[in-house]
Amino acid sequence: MAQIKNYTLNFGPQHPAAHGVLRLVLELDGEVIQRADPHIGLLHRATEKLAKTRTWIQNIPYMDRLDYVSMMSNEHAYVMAIEKLLQVDVPLRAQYIRVMYDELTRLLNHLLWIGCHGLDVGAMAVFLYAFRDREDIFDMYEAVSGARMHAAYYRPGGVYRDLPDQMAQYDKSKIRSASAVKRLNENRSGTLLDFIEQFANGFDANVDEYCNLLTDNRIWKQRLVNIGIVTPKRALQLGFTGPMLRGSGIEWDLRKKQPYEVYDRLDFDIPVGVNGDSYDRYLVRMEEMRQSNHIIKQCVAWLKANPGPVMSTNHKVSPPKRVDMKTNMEELIHHFKLFTEGIHVPDGEAYSAVEHPKGEFGIYLISDGANKPYRMKIRAPGFVHLSSMDEMSRGHMLADAVTIIGTQDIVFGEIDR
C-alpha cells in the first residue's frame, strides 16, 4: 500500500486571517501541521534606511507607520531615544499626556486584536462591539493631532500641543440627521479630558461585555485552550516580551521593571498567565485593558488639576509660539531653521524602549552630530513572536494556525519595516 506523503500548502499572503501580508508555507500530514515557515518582507519599505535621509523631526511620521495600530507608542520610543541623546527634560504635564495616550493606544490595539481574533475563530459580534469603542479613541487622537490614525503628536521635549478645551462637534449633513447629530454630540459638550473621562468610566463595563461573550464560551475555549503552549523558560529563550511573555507566567513589564515617564507614580497591576496557552494570553490582554483604563483615569484626574507647559523650554528643540513667529524676525528665523535644517543632536548612541501593546518596542539611535540620524535600528516585538510560529504550531491542526497567528497579535508594518 502506497504511503501518503506530507504535502505543502501556501497560507496567504492574501488570506483574510493572515493579519497583513503573511505568507506561511505549511507542511501538512493530513490536517496536522508538521512545519510552518513564515515568509516575510512583502511590506518592506526600508524605514531604517529612509530615516537616515530625513531630519530627526521628519522621522516621527515614519514611526506611526510601523505598527499602524499602535501609533503613539511607536513615536514614544523614538522621541525618548532623541531626548536621551539631547539630555532634554520633559515637562511633567507632557509626561502625563504621553502616558495617557500610550494607554489609549494600548486599548486601540487590544480592541483590534480581540475583534480580529474573535472573527478569525468565528465570533462575529465582538468584532462589531470592539470597533464601536475604537471610534471614540480615534476621536481622541483627532482632537489633539488632527489625524485619526497617524498622529505625529509626540515631539522631542514634549508633545505638539496641549489638550484642547473643546471637543469637536458633529454637524448635520446629508449622511447625518439632526437626531443622529444630537446623539453623537451628547458627550462632546465639554473638554477633551471630559470626553476621555466619560469614555473611561464606561469602558470597564464594555470589557465585561466582551468577557461575557467569550471567556466561558464553550467553542471559544475549545479553540484556544492548550493551543500554542509556550513554557516560561522557552518564552525567555525565544525573546518573548509583552503579553506573549506574561501569558507564560513571567511578570515582566517595562512600565514596572524599568519605569519611564510617570509610570512609577501610577497604580496598576501586571496580569500574568499560568498555562502559557492562547487562552491565557487572551485573559492577560483582557485584564490589561482594565489596567490601562485604570491608568487613564488617574492621568485624567492629574491633568485636570495641574495645568502647565507641555513642551521643553530648551529652544534648541522647541519651536517658538506661532504668534511670536509671525510678529518677531528672530523667532521667524528660529522657526525656519528648526524646520528646514532641523535640530543637531550631539554625538552618541542611545537605546530607548517602551512597553508597547505587543511587547518591548525599542529604538536604537546613533548620532554623528548631524541633523539626521547616522543609524536607526528598530526592535519590533512582532518580529520575535512570528519567528516562533513553527515551534508553536507544530503538531496542531491546520485550523489552529489561525488561532496562533491571532494570539501572537501580528502587524506587518513593524515586522517588515
From Swiss-Prot:
UniProt topology in membrane: Peripheral membrane protein
Q: What's its catalytic activity? A: a quinone + NADH + 5 H(+)(in) = a quinol + NAD(+) + 4 H(+)(out)
Instruction: Name the SUPFAM superfamilies on file.
Output: HydB/Nqo4-like (SSF56762)
Q: Which domain of life is it from?
A: Bacteria
Q: Does the keyword Cell inner membrane apply?
A: yes
Cell compartments where the protein resides:
Cell inner membrane
Q: Name one GO molecular function term.
A: NADH:ubiquinone reductase (non-electrogenic) activity
Which keywords annotate this record? Cell inner membrane, Cell membrane, Membrane, NAD, Quinone, Translocase, Transport, Ubiquinone
| Coiled-coil ranges from the UniProt annotation | none
Any idea of its EC number?
7.1.1.-
Q: Does the keyword Cell inner membrane apply?
A: yes
Q: Which GO terms describe its cellular component?
A: plasma membrane
Pfam families for the chain:
Complex1_49kDa
Kindly state the subunit structure of this protein: NDH-1 is composed of 14 different subunits. Subunits NuoB, C, D, E, F, and G constitute the peripheral sector of the complex.
The record's comment on protein family reads: Belongs to the complex I 49 kDa subunit family.
HAMAP family cross-referenced by the UniProt entry: NDH1_NuoD
Q: Main role?
A: NDH-1 shuttles electrons from NADH, via FMN and iron-sulfur (Fe-S) centers, to quinones in the respiratory chain. The immediate electron acceptor for the enzyme in this species is believed to be ubiquinone. Couples the redox reaction to proton translocation (for every two electrons transferred, four hydrogen ions are translocated across the cytoplasmic membrane), and thus conserves the redox energy in a proton gradient.
Name of this chain's protein: NADH-quinone oxidoreductase subunit D
Q: Which organism is it from?
A: Polynucleobacter necessarius subsp. necessarius (strain STIR1)
